[in-house]
């Protein structure tokens, strides 16, 4: 049976042959279309293979019970209450989707200048995470670490009297938010803000809090997602 080492050697040889210069005339023998001609060679040469294992399902959660709201800018996507969230999460498990990305939609009454609701242990995101991990413990839960859902002004950070976003003060709140997610059971926290130094601060706080297995997802790895 052909092992992976031998298969890799053969594939490498194919690539070398494709880069050989032809002696028949002046036209180069580098014709990349050759390897795209047949299905078998396209399969051998393709860089990416999208499978269910590669999927993360975005879910937007709102307060209430038995609530579903369409998101006009994303046809087919809905904001759902926690009870409906659990139903959809169960469908994700049945389909083999390994993880969901959770985005809370806070009501206006929950928003403030200091975004304190972001790290409320009984906040919407935190309750949703606990419910998900209790109902579907093997489903990965990724949470969004950002303040814009919770600030009255809509900025992704704390601001001063001139509207300038305060970096270090914002990082302190982001750390509290990430810790509250980890305490609720989040497997991965994903900071989507743009504050300098927040990754190191979050990692340090997670380690100090004993959440050594909580991972941090860079949004640079998430650029092609729906969310």
Model-derived features: where do they sit?
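N-terminal amphipathic alpha-helix/helix-capping segment at the start of soluble metabolic enzymes
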Residues: 18-62, 67
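Short, positively charged and aromatic/hydrophobic N-terminal segments
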Residues: 3-4, 9-19
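Alpha/beta enzyme core
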Residues: 66-69, 80-227
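Short intrinsically disordered, low-complexity coil segments enriched in acidic
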Residues: 1-3, 207
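Intrinsic disorder/low-structure terminal segments
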Residues: 1, 9-10, 26, 222, ...
């Amino acid at each position: 049976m052909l092992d992976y080492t031998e298969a890799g050697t053969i594939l490498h040889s194919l690539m070398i042959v494709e880069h050989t210069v032809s002696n028949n005339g002046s036209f180069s023998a580098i014709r990349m279309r050759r390897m795209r001609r047949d299905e078998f060679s396209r399969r051998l040469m393709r860089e990416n293979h999208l499978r269910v294992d590669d999927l993360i399902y975005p879910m937007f959660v709102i307060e209430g019970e038995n609530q579903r709201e369409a998101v006009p800018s994303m046809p087919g996507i809905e904001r759902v209450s926690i009870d409906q969230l659990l139903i959809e999460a169960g469908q994700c498990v049945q389909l083999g989707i390994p993880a969901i990305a959770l985005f809370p939609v806070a009501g206006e009454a929950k928003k403030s200048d200091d975004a304190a609701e972001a790290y409320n242990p009984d906040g919407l995101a935190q309750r949703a995470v606990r419910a998900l991990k209790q109902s579907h413990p093997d489903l990965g839960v990724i949470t969004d670490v950002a303040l814009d859902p919770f600030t009255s002004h809509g900025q992704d950070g704390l601001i001063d009297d001139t509207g300038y976003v305060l970096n270090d003060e914002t990082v302190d709140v982001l750390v509290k938010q990430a810790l509250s997610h980890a305490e609720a059971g989040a497997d991965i926290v994903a900071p989507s803000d743009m504050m300098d130094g927040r990754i190191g601060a979050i990692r340090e706080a997670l380690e100090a809090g004993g959440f050594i297995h909580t991972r941090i997802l860079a949004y640079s790895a998430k650029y092609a997602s729906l969310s």
